[in-house]
Design a protein with these regions (language model features):
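Bacterial N-terminal signal peptides that target proteins for export
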Residues: 2-13
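Gly/Gly-Pro-rich "capping" loops immediately C-terminal to redox-active cysteine motifs
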Residues: 36-37, 41-43, 47, 63-91
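The canonical Cys-X-X-Cys-His
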Residues: 46, 50-60, 106, 118-122
Length: 132
């Protein structure tokens, strides 16, 4: 005959085992997303350069501001504004044509390599938002 203490110990041991199995889940950790605030390592240089040179107008995570348009928008999808469009915009500036924010000046503080990193970061943000 089991005593109430023995039954409680068995139930406690079973629950502890279940808890340990759950804690030892071997699945991969969730992948970083823009909304999680975690940017994958390969896009962090672009994020830093974007934040220094672009975010004042284009906003945090390229979401736009009252000074410039969002780059995470279907207007800037790769099939409409390819990667070279970003290079030209940084090197030459852009005459306003989609938005009413005024013309974008050329950005002399970035190199073509910097723009490549910025584009990789922006494209990653776009993919996170379902813009392919």
């Amino acid at each position: 005959m089991k005593t109430p203490v023995t039954s409680k110990l068995q139930i406690g041991a079973w629950l502890l085992s279940l808890g340990l199995l759950t804690a030892c889940d071997a699945s991969e950790p969730p992948k970083p997303t823009a909304s999680s605030g975690l940017v994958p390592t390969e896009f962090q240089a672009g994020e830093t350069t974007f934040n220094t040179n672009c975010a004042a107008c284009h906003g945090k995570q390229a979401a736009g501001t009252d000074h410039g348009p969002p780059l995470v928008h279907k207007v800037y999808e790769p099939n409409h504004h390819g990667d070279q469009a970003f290079q030209r915009a940084a090197a030459n500036g852009v005459q306003a044509h989609h938005w009413q924010f005024g013309n974008m000046p050329k950005i002399e503080s970035v190199t073509p390599g910097d723009v490549d990193q910025i584009v990789k970061y922006v494209r990653w943000l776009q993919r996170q938002a379902g813009i392919e």
